[in-house]
């Protein structure tokens, strides 16, 4: 994988002596790829790429976004109108979010239709389903953060759905809203979920998902 000029350098030899990077490079570059693999097997990688774009653009917006019911909408307008390239960053975040959900759905269908969920890859499928749920949760929580009319009523409707569940329904609603009604508590919880809890969860399950794929390889044709 490395050229002779690189492998003969003192810097390379220093790292090789301590980390055995040649063995790591050989393992990465020599993994067998079945001949039946086509472009549809790239959907998972595209989903990951969309997530990385989401992470970068979302992190950039946290410098300007204010998670309060009185300032959230104004801070989003500030990002769009006054921050250098803010309109571009938020637009990329918005469209890559839609693309991530679409690619995730297509990836799930591809795995299901090609039988990639069967033995011995059941746990890979389970972690994938968990990742799908987390991805949708990103969409639900992120949709509310601009705190405009669309975001407010979307949160009100979504958080009110569990009220139909007997006994525990009202408790779940209050837990989701941070109180009896939609307000500052709701926005704070959704912001915390969107920027801290869900990113950590998706990182953990992505790591598990990739390690399993790396260990078991790509499933064979039907």
Swiss-Prot record:
Q: Which cofactor does it need?
A: heme b; heme c
Its annotated compartments are: Cellular thylakoid membrane
GO CC, sorted alphabetically, is: plasma membrane-derived thylakoid membrane
Q: Its GO biological process terms?
A: photosynthesis; respiratory electron transport chain
**Cofactor mode of binding and number, as noted:** Binds 2 heme b groups non-covalently with two histidine residues as axial ligands. Binds one heme group covalently by a single cysteine link with no axial amino acid ligand. This heme was named heme ci.
Q: Which residues bind heme b 2?
A: 93, 194
Q: Which PROSITE patterns match?
A: CYTB_NTER
Q: Which InterPro entries match?
A: Cyt_b/b6_N, Cyt_B6_PetB, Cytb/b6-like_sf, Cytochrome_b_N_euk/bac, Di-haem_cyt_TM
Amino acids binding heme b 1: 107, 209
Q: What does this protein do?
A: Component of the cytochrome b6-f complex, which mediates electron transfer between photosystem II (PSII) and photosystem I (PSI), cyclic electron flow around PSI, and state transitions.
The family this protein is said to belong to: Belongs to the cytochrome b family. PetB subfamily.
Protein known as: Cytochrome b6
Gene this chain is encoded by: petB
């Amino acid at each position: 994988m490395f050229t002779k000029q690189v492998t003969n350098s003192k810097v390379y030899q220093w790292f090789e002596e301590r980390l055995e990077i040649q063995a790591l490079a050989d393992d990465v570059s020599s993994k067998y790829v079945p001949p039946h693999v086509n472009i549809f097997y790239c959907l998972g990688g595209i989903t990951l790429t969309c997530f990385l774009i989401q992470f970068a653009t979302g992190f950039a917006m946290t410098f300007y976004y204010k998670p309060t019911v009185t300032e959230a909408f104004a801070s989003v307008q500030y990002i769009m109108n006054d921050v250098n390239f803010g309109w571009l960053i938020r637009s990329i975040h918005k469209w890559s979010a839609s693309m991530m959900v679409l690619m995730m759905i297509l990836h799930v269908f591809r795995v299901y239709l090609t039988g990639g969920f069967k033995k011995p890859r059941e746990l890979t499928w389970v972690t994938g389903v968990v990742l799908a749920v987390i991805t949708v949760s990103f969409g639900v929580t992120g949709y509310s953060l601009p705190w405009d009319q669309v975001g407010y009523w979307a949160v009100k409707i979504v958080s009110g759905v569990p009220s139909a569940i007997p006994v525990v329904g009202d408790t779940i609603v209050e837990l989701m809203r941070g109180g009896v009604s939609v307000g500052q508590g709701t926005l704070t919880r959704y912001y915390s979920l969107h920027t801290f809890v869900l990113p950590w969860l998706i990182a953990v399950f992505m790591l598990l998902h990739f390690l399993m794929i790396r260990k078991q390889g790509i499933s064979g044709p039907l």
